[in-house]
Each structure stands twice: as structure tokens, then as C-alpha cells.
């Protein structure tokens, strides 16, 4: 996409991630919008509105980060865990365009909160862990930072600043209906090779300050507007630049990897006595998938067949 407005843009970019670069500013980014996929993931749970909203934001953030992976089998996991927080655990992951996520929380304590609930009110003291698993390269990277700031986006920026030392801007938004969520990630490219100053060590670099100033003009309703094509959104933000290179959109889908064989393989790791202790009054070991809420009832005969 050049700096002129695209003549023919897609009607909407629901359930897609679009990567882009601004070569003259040494910046790269991703913009994501979720629609039906978000509904599909949330429909597996009966979450109250505040919990559904924070999970929606986390799913968008996971898509923004996961779509950076170049390895098809690579996996990105976002995990927020707290000490005595209303939200005990939030987990989302991305692999090959597929998203899933869930939240464990205290319903009674949530109901006691006032209507305005910031990040600290929901999580209290906790941490954000972001893990990149790259099986082809046999590598695993994990960064852990405190859950700080008033939003999940602020916590993500803290992760990039502290763990990767890459100047980054993250914005996340959920529309009033809760059925559409969007987000944008913009970073200053760490271009330096050995012997050169790496751009990401200069947090006050004028190129980054310029890009960040433009990106900060984005509105929440632009990110979550299903009628606004993502390329048009990028043009609105950066049309004064010499060039914006938009990449082919990456389709996103709900993907849960639970199945009978996987559950069976997990249970088979337990000894026979432990397996018998798990059997319920109906004669089954029932295993719930927290991601998609499916229940797998397995008898001992099926387990040991």
C-alpha cells in the first residue's frame, strides 16, 4: 500500500491480521480485528461482561503477537496470573492462525466491584508472561513482567520495554456490543547489526517519536469498527509517509486442540490406582477442556484399551 488511499479495499477485515511496515521510519506493525471468531470463543463460556471484555482484549493481543511468528508450528502463549486477584488466571494462545483462551475468576468478588474496573481492580498483584515456542528451531523464549498500568495494552507495552527493549505501542479496543474487538501493535525495528547502534536501544529516537505520535491519534471505535477496512485505517494514520507496505492478511480462526486421543494420552500417564480414584459415580473419568468447555467422559476400559 503506497501513501495514496487504496481505491478498492475489502469491505471489512473481520478475523484477520494485517502486517505492515513503514520503511522510511524503520517501523513495523500489525493490526487485527476479530468478529465471528471472537463470538465463537466467548460462546463456549458464560462470562460476565467485564471478564468477556478482558478476554477479548487478550485474544486480540495474542493475535497481534502470534501473527509475528514465521514458523508455521510456532506457538505464542499469553498468560496473566495473580496473587489473590479477582481474575486468578487468564490464558490465550495462537498457533498457525488459530486462537483460543479462557479465564478463571472469582464471581462473588467480581460482583462486589464498582462499575469502573481497571486492570489492577481485576488482577491485583500479578504478572504477565509471554512465551514463544519454536519447535522447528528447538527454541523457547519467555518474558515475564509485572502486571502494571491501567490496561492490558499498557502491560503489553511494559513487556516489550522490559523484556525485549523494543519501543512499542499497543492499543486494544472492544465495541459496545462485545462482538467485535480490534488492536494495533507498532514497533521500532531493531535494525542494527554488530558494530552499529541498535535502534531499539534509543527510546527517544526521532523516527519512533514521529510514528508513535501519529499512532496515538487512533480511536478505539476505529479499531473495532467492522465497516472500516484495516488498510483504510492504516492510510488514515500514516498517509503522510513516503510509503506504507501492507502485507497479505492472515486469516484467524478459533482452534482448540483438545480431542479424545489427547485426553487419553494425558490420563495414561497416571498409575492405575490414581486412575481408579478419578472415576465418578457413573463409571467415567470426566475431563473438562477449559478453553472450549468440552467434556470428555472416558471409561477405564477405553483408557486402557
Task: Describe the residue ranges of each PLM region.
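Interaction interfaces in information-processing and related assembly proteins
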Residues: 2-247
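Cys/His-clustered metal-coordination modules, chiefly Zn-binding fingers
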Residues: 212-305
Amino acid at each position: 500500500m503506497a501513501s495514496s488511499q487504496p481505491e478498492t479495499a475489502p469491505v471489512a477485515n473481520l478475523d484477520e491480521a494485517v502486517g505492515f511496515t513503514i520503511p522510511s521510519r524503520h517501523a513495523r506493525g500489525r493490526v487485527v480485528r476479530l468478529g465471528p471468531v471472537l463470538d465463537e470463543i466467548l460462546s463456549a463460556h458464560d462470562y460476565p461482561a467485564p471478564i468477556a471484555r478482558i478476554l477479548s482484549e487478550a485474544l486480540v493481543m495474542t493475535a497481534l503477537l502470534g501473527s509475528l511468528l514465521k514458523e508455521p508450528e510456532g506457538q505464542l502463549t499469553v498468560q496473566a496470573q495473580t496473587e489473590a486477584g479477582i481474575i486468578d488466571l487468564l490464558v490465550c494462545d495462537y498457533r498457525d492462525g488459530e486462537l483460543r483462551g479462557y479465564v478463571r475468576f472469582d464471581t462473588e468478588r467480581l460482583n462486589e466491584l464498582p462499575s469502573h474496573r481497571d486492570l489492577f481492580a481485576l488482577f491485583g498483584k500479578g504478572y504477565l508472561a509471554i512465551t514463544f515456542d519454536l519447535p522447528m528451531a528447538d527454541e523457547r523464549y519467555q518474558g515475564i513482567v509485572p502486571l502494571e498500568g491501567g490496561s492490558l495494552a499498557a502491560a503489553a507495552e511494559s513487556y516489550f520495554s522490559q523484556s525485549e527493549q523494543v519501543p512499542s505501542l499497543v492499543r486494544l479496543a472492544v465495541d459496545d456490543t462485545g462482538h467485535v474487538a480490534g488492536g494495533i501493535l507498532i514497533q521500532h525495528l531493531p535494525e542494527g547489526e554488530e558494530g552499529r547502534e541498535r535502534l531499539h536501544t534509543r527510546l527517544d529516537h526521532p523516527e519512533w517519536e514521529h510514528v508513535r505520535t501519529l499512532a496515538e491519534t487512533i480511536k478505539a471505535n476505529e479499531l473495532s469498527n467492522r465497516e472500516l477496512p484495516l488498510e483504510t485505517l492504516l492510510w488514515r494514520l500514516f498517509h503522510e509517509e513516503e510509503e506504507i507496505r501492507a502485507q497479505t492478511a492472515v486469516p484467524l480462526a478459533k482452534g482448540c486442540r483438545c480431542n479424545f486421543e489427547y485426553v487419553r494420552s494425558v490420563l495414561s500417564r497416571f498409575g492405575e490406582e490414581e486412575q481408579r480414584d478419578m472415576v465418578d459415580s457413573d463409571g467415567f473419568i470426566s475431563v473438562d477442556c477449559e478453553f472450549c468447555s468440552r467434556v470428555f467422559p472416558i471409561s477405564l476400559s477405553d483408557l486402557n484399551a
